[in-house]
Design a protein with these regions (language model features):
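Alpha/beta-hydrolase superfamily serine-hydrolase fold, recognizing
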Residues: 1-203
C-alpha cells in the first residue's frame, strides 16, 4: 500500500493534486521491481476528495493507456461539481459535511466553473467509461455526496464496468473514520477489508 502525499488546494489547485497522484502511479510501474510490486494488483483508492482523485486517475490512466489498473475503490467519493442533487437538497446542513463547506472546497480546488465540467474534475461527466477497472463504491446515505456516488456507480455499470456498491443507511459522510462511535462504521471497515481480500486473491 502506498499513500500519496499529494499537494493540496488552495495552495496547489487542480490539476496539481491529480498530477501528483498520476505521477505516483507511473513511478510505481516504472520502479515495480525495486519496490516489490505486483502490477497485476495495482489499484487506486480514496475517500471523499481522495475518491475523486482515485476516480479521475483511473480515467486518465485508461485514456492515456499509461497504467493498467486492477480496480478502483471509492469511499463516499466526490464525482461531480454540481450541487443540484437530491442529496444536496436533503442534507445541505445538519448532517456533518454541508453544502456550504463543499462549495468552499470547490472554490479552492477548481475556481473556474468551466473547468469543473471536465471529466478529470467531475468523473460523472466522462463521455466514456468503458475499459475502466472494476469499481467498488461505499456510500453513506445521509451524505450530500450520496446521489452523485450512486449516479457514478450507475454510469459505470451502464458503460460495461464491473461494479459493486455498498450503501450504509443512516450514515454520514466520513463515517468509516468514526468506527469507534458507529457499529455500522466497524461493519463497513470489516466489509471493505473482506472485499479487498476477495478481490486480490483472484488477481
Amino acid at each position: 500500500m502506498i499513500s500519496v502525499a499529494y499537494r493540496r488546494a488552495p495552495e496547489h489547485p487542480y490539476p496539481i493534486p491529480l498530477d501528483d497522484c498520476c505521477d505516483a502511479l507511473t513511478y510505481c510501474v516504472e520502479h515495480a521491481s525495486e519496490l516489490g510490486l505486483d502490477l497485476g494488483r495495482l489499484a487506486v483508492a480514496g475517500d471523499s476528495a481522495g475518491g475523486n482523485l482515485a476516480a479521475a486517475a483511473a480515467l486518465r490512466m485508461q485514456k492515456n493507456q499509461q497504467v493498467t489498473l486492477h480496480s478502483q475503490w471509492l469511499l463516499y467519493p466526490v464525482t461531480q461539481a454540481s450541487f443540484d442533487t437530491t442529496s444536496y437538497r436533503r442534507y445541505a446542513s445538519g448532517f456533518g459535511l454541508s453544502l456550504a463547506t463543499m462549495q468552499w472546497f470547490w472554490d479552492q480546488y477548481v475556481p473556474d466553473a468551466e473547468v469543473r465540467l471536465e471529466a478529470e474534475v467531475s468523473p460523472l461527466n466522462a463521455s466514456r467509461v468503458d475499459g475502466l477497472p472494476k469499481a467498488f463504491l461505499y456510500l453513506a446515505e445521509r451524505d450530500v455526496l450520496y446521489a452523485e456516488g450512486l449516479a457514478y456507480a450507475t454510469k459505470l455499470q451502464q458503460g460495461g464496468v464491473e461494479v459493486q456498491t455498498r450503501v450504509y443507511p443512516g450514515m454520514l459522510h466520513g463515517f468509516m473514520h468514526f468506527s469507534g462511535f458507529f457499529d455500522v462504521g466497524r461493519q463497513a471497515l470489516s466489509e471493505w477489508c473482506l472485499d479487498l481480500k476477495k478481490a486480490f486473491q483472484t488477481a
